[in-house]
Amino acid sequence: MNVIRARTAGFCMGVSLALRKLDREVDRAEEKAAQGSPRCRIATFGPIIHNPQVLEAYAGMGVRCLRQVDEVEAGDHVVIRAHGVPQQQEKALRSRDAVVVDATCPKVKKAQLGIEEQCRAGRTLLLFGEAEHPEVRGLLSYAGEGALVFGSVDELEGLPLQPETEYFLAAQTTQDRVAFEVARAWLHERLGHEVPVLETICDATRLRQQEAIDIARKVDAMVVVGGFDSGNTRRLADVAAAQGVFTVHVENESQLPVEQLRGCGIIGLTAGASTPKSIIDATQRFLESL
């Protein structure tokens, strides 16, 4: 089986940075324990990234995943997830007697602060994203009153837009660039003027999606590897499938639909921004063995 593997597949800068910060806390805790000091408890606030294998590995190291601020105990070292958290939660975390390490992706943090600045200037946010995604919940916390979220142009068309309101447009950092531009054009037509835009979709997302599209146009089938909870991975699968090629999204090689793939001559392989290289490698080896 011939496999074309995306060069952009695997960890992005934000994920790598978040995991390095968490690893550093784990290493420091182990060093202190080796010196005879009590081992401090390490936790993340929410899953550090959206990948089940990575989360399982950290759980095996004793890293806890907290969901509520009141779960934080004195002396805990708490690492904020790569997706960021609502600013009210971050403030509450920092009020606890704990060490708080912010592992929010720099691109997400920039989006948070940009949204806050626009809202302070009197504009109202229109956010293209998944309403229940943790990054989106965090972004909205910087937006104040009146912010509106939409996950598609169809949803945008159904929003109660007010002609007298000064809007600005932003997106979840891992959103589909093409769909974002369609939304931007629709707003221009609907409101009769260009809406100010925050360019919050990160370059890594844009490059990954474009490479997935390019590969999908050359192959008989497309395999996208990454957590089912990962929004950026789901969108890679979406943009690949939109090219008319059979596309499958799996978390590891054991989930591959072997019989459907066996007759393919060329298979494309890409992966989400939170997928470890080891899983991508294992998937590639399995595909090449078919």
Swiss-Prot record:
The UniProt entry, under Gene3D superfamilies, shows: 3.40.50.11270, 4-hydroxy-3-methylbut-2-enyl diphosphate reductase, catalytic domain
Q: What biological processes does GO assign it? A: dimethylallyl diphosphate biosynthetic process; isopentenyl diphosphate biosynthetic process, methylerythritol 4-phosphate pathway; terpenoid biosynthetic process
Q: What are the binding positions for (2E)-4-hydroxy-3-methylbut-2-enyl diphosphate in this chain?
A: 50, 83, 133, 173, 230, 232, 274
Provide the residue positions that the database annotates as binding isopentenyl diphosphate.
Answer: 50, 83, 133, 230, 232, 274
Pathway per its UniProt entry is: Isoprenoid biosynthesis; dimethylallyl diphosphate biosynthesis; dimethylallyl diphosphate from (2E)-4-hydroxy-3-methylbutenyl diphosphate: step 1/1; Isoprenoid biosynthesis; isopentenyl diphosphate biosynthesis via DXP pathway; isopentenyl diphosphate from 1-deoxy-D-xylulose 5-phosphate: step 6/6
Q: Which InterPro entries match?
A: LytB/IspH
Entry cofactors: [4Fe-4S] cluster
The active site consists of: 135
Task: Supply the NCBIfam families for this chain.
Answer: ispH_lytB (TIGR00216)
**Described purpose of this protein according to its UniProt entry:** Catalyzes the conversion of 1-hydroxy-2-methyl-2-(E)-butenyl 4-diphosphate (HMBPP) into a mixture of isopentenyl diphosphate (IPP) and dimethylallyl diphosphate (DMAPP). Acts in the terminal step of the DOXP/MEP pathway for isoprenoid precursor biosynthesis.
Instruction: Please give the name of this protein.
Output: 4-hydroxy-3-methylbut-2-enyl diphosphate reductase
Taxonomic source organism: Nitratidesulfovibrio vulgaris (strain ATCC 29579 / DSM 644 / CCUG 34227 / NCIMB 8303 / VKM B-1760 / Hildenborough)
What does the organism's lineage look like at the top?
Bacteria, Pseudomonadati, Thermodesulfobacteriota, Desulfovibrionia, Desulfovibrionales
